[in-house]
From Swiss-Prot, chain A:
Involved in the targeting and/or fusion of transport vesicles to their target membrane. The longin domain is essential for the vacuolar and subcellular targeting. Residues 211-219 are vesicular. The chain crosses the membrane at residues 190-210. This is Vesicle-associated membrane protein 711. The keyword Transport applies.
Swiss-Prot record, chain B:
This is Syntaxin-22. Residues 1-23 are annotated as: Disordered. Residues 175-237 form the t-SNARE coiled-coil homology domain. The gene is SYP22. Keywords: Acetylation, Coiled coil, Membrane, Protein transport, Transmembrane, Transmembrane helix, Transport, Vacuole. It comes from Arabidopsis thaliana. Residues 2-246 are cytoplasmic. It comes from the Eukaryota.
Length: 219, 268
């Protein structure tokens, strides 16, 4: 919670206030209202322990808020500007003649809503929203890096496996070639054996017809 | 002014080539373009009527723009008539006729738009009264300054001094806000730099993995080639083995017959 307390006042007359936590902000705020110098428009900040009181005075109307030191100035003063515009838009010229706490019942709810908005909603400040978005982008990119590294590991495994597959297919090709050679040689031997057998049979037949192993009648 | 210069330059160059035929078409096209521009300006002025910017000067400008567009419409209408008369002659290029017809339709469209804008302007001119700035105020200020007294002068100096103090405070405040905003922007800039570094790292990783994928592709291609060759070797081996079976069968048959003959001969 960045903004803890807010009030709207005319001079030192408090018209509306809201406190988000139980602190002594109200007392200190009233002291600050008396201490703010001059009657002209101004923007000032007062430090008190860990909190800072930001005061904005415009056209006789003073808007004050108490914020944590870490909230900086941009968001609290944007809050003050917003509250001032809403207050003037809602009550107009009645601001200059109203009694103390005259608008407190209605406007304290608006103060509460805006305190919550400027304290918690990233959209209240464009720079903070962009910071948040850049953080998201960075997270997504780091996640992407992790995924790509994981993918790299799997690709390495795949490289190893495909290298093994390549080796196996080379071996398969070599063995297939050897097998073909063996089968061819067996075929060759069978052919030669068949030819020899046929020659032997022919010789025996011719020898029988020629009446002798040395073929005397035919030669 | 620059457009008119461009137009005159273009007209001069075109006249050398075409002998003046295309000159009228080009003139009509540029006229329609100028009318379009004028009508846009006129509409923008009409949209300003009824707003705090509505002043007698604006009304005067509106009037001048209306007259200017009227003159442009008159000139372009004459040129369009001249171009259409040229189209009726024999031997005119059909594409020129088509272009002139298109220009005529464009001219009609822009005229309708101008008439609509004129009606809107007339309505708003009667509805609204121009905003006259208060010229009486400066004279009263001037009268006030004439009666300056030393006491008022001293008060004026004191007021100026306070004003300077307030301005200094305002400057300090604005500088603090600007400093804070700059710090936030610096952080955003730093984060963007980090994201840039992450993107570069990612690019390096993706490139390396591209090399790995190329290796995988090479391995798979080699495996496919080797498998194809092995398959062809096996197919040939299968054919040879089939031939072996036939030869073995033939040998057995012949051997059987020989044995049979020998047995018959011995038995006899």
């Amino acid at each position: 919670m960045a903004i803890l307390y807010a009030l709207v006042a005319r001079g030192t007359v408090v018209l509306s206030e809201f406190t988000a936590t139980s602190t002594n902000a109200s007392t200190i705020a009233k002291q600050i209202l008396e201490k703010v110098p001059g009657d002209n428009d101004s923007n000032v900040s007062y430090s008190q322990d860990r909190y800072v009181f930001h005061v904005k005075r415009t056209d006789g109307l003073t808007v004050l808020c108490m914020a944590e030191e870490t909230a900086g100035r941009r968001i609290p003063f944007a809050f003050l500007e917003d509250i001032h515009q809403r207050f003037v838009r809602t009550y107009g010229r009645a601001v200059h003649t109203a009694l103390a706490y005259a608008m407190n019942e209605e406007f304290s709810r608006v103060l509460s809503q805006q305190i919550d908005y400027y304290s918690n909603d990233p959209n209240a400040d464009r720079i903070n929203r962009i910071k948040g978005e850049m953080n998201q982008v960075r997270g997504v990119m780091i996640e992407n890096i992790d995924k790509v590294l994981d993918r790299g590991e799997r690709l390495e495994l795949l490289v190893d496996k495909t290298a093994n597959m390549q080796g196996n297919t080379f071996r398969f090709r070599k063995q297939a070639r050897r097998f073909r050679s063996n089968v061819w040689w067996r075929n060759c031997k069978l052919t030669v054996l068949l030819i020899l057998l046929l020659l032997v049979i022919i010789y025996i037949a011719v020898a029988f017809l020629c009446h002798g192993p040395t073929l005397p009648s035919c030669i | 002014m620059s457009f008119q210069d461009l137009e005159s330059g273009r007209g001069r160059s075109t006249r050398k080539f075409n002998g003046g035929r295309q000159d009228s078409t080009q003139a009509v096209a540029s006229g329609i373009f100028q009318i379009n521009t004028g009508v846009s300006t006129f509409q923008r002025l009409v949209n300003t009527l009824g707003t705090p910017k509505d002043t007698p000067e604006l009304r005067e400008k509106l009037h001048k723009t209306r007259l200017h567009i009227g003159q442009l419409v008159k000139d372009t209408s004459a040129k369009l008539k001249e171009a259409s008369e040229t189209d009726h002659q024999s031997g005119v290029n059909p594409s020129k006729k088509i272009a002139d017809a298109k220009l005529a339709r464009d001219f009609q469209a822009v005229l309708k738009e101008f008439q609509k804008a004129q009606q809107t302007a007339a309505e708003r001119e009667t509805t609204y009264t121009p905003f006259v700035p208060q010229s009486a105020l400066p004279s009263s200020y001037t009268a006030g300054e004439v009666d300056k007294v030393p006491e008022q002068r001293a008060q004026l100096q004191e007021s100026k001094r306070q004003e300077l103090v307030l301005l200094d405070n305002e400057i300090a405040f604005n500088e603090a806000v600007i400093e804070e905003r700059e710090q936030g922007i610096q952080e955003i800039h730093q984060q963007i730099g980090e994201v840039n570094e992450i993107f570069k790292d990612l690019a390096v990783l993706v490139n390396d993995q591209g090399v790995m994928i190329d290796d995988i592709g090479t391995h798979i291609d080699n495996s496919r080639a080797a498998t194809s060759q092995g398959k062809s070797q096996l197919v040939q081996a299968a054919k040879t083995q089939k031939s072996n079976s036939s030869l073995t069968c033939l040998l057995l048959v012949i051997f059987g017959i020989v044995l049979l003959i020998v047995i018959i001969v011995l038995a006899a």
